[in-house]
Curated annotation (Swiss-Prot):
It comes from Chlorobaculum tepidum (strain ATCC 49652 / DSM 12025 / NBRC 103806 / TLS). Pfam families: PS_Dcarbxylase. This is Phosphatidylserine decarboxylase proenzyme. It is found in: Cell membrane. It is an enzyme of class 4 (lyase). Binds 1 pyruvoyl group covalently per subunit.
């Protein structure tokens, strides 16, 4: 099982901690020692599961915009956006602690701008989190026009990882970061993109097609 590079440090620290707990448990009276050792093993296995980073098959096709995150679409609405213009579509993907948390680039492009905002830590399924929570906003210049998406931390997730830089060329489906322990990713698509998803649908980062346009 591949472990996300963004989580290597956390996995190593957890493994060391659990090893110490396991050794300590060997010298404790039973069944307390067994219970403690089992809990440590369970915690280590959950950590490995959380930081898993499976390979994804990027769909072939012209003009595809793919999901940047695993999860469930909790909001889809039309709006006017300062980056993507009038008639844009917002798609919000909620990521539970049991989803893969590695984020992927939705479409080929050039990173125009990155903006980090400090903020609150409301529950990620609370739509106020889009504007009130800690977040990283990313603007891509694409062949179909500008596209905006945002990593939003949640009540449990308080660590956003984004390894992009302004001016960087990026390819659809490539890993660019993660949000730890439950969160959401919002993406705003310009009106030139035909939306292929609806609220309630589950998404797979790097595979689920959110929309398509012939303008690429």
């Amino acid at each position: 099982m591949r472990i996300a590079p963004y989580g290597t440090g956390s996995v190593v620290k957890t493994a060391i901690f659990c090893f110490v707990i396991f050794i300590t448990a060997l010298f404790l009276p039973q069944p307390g020692g067994v219970i403690l050792a089992t809990a440590a093993l369970g915690f280590l296995l959950f950590t490995l599961y959380f930081y898993r980073d499976p390979e994804r098959k990027i769909p072939d096709g012209k003009g595809l915009v793919i999901a940047p995150a695993d999860g469930k679409i909790v909001l889809k609405q039309t709006l006017d956006h300062p980056v993507t213009g009038p008639g844009s579509t917002l798609v919000s993907i909620f990521m539970s602690p049991f989803n893969v948390h590695v984020n992927r680039i939705p479409v080929d492009g050039l990173v125009r701008d990155l903006r980090y905002h400090e903020g609150k830590f409301l529950m990620a399924f609370d739509h106020r989190s889009m504007t009130d929570n800690e977040r990283m906003e990313i603007t891509l210049d694409t062949a179909a026009g500008p596209l905006w998406f945002c990593q939003v931390s949640g009540f449990v997730a308080r660590r956003i990882v984004c390894d992009l830089e302004a001016g960087q060329e990026v390819a659809s489906g490539k890993r660019f970061g993660m949000i730890k322990l439950g969160s959401r990713v919002d993406i705003v698509l310009p009106s030139s993109i035909q939306i292929k998803v609806k609220e309630g649908m589950k998404t797979t980062a790097g595979e689920t097609i959110l929309g398509q346009t012939g303008g690429f």
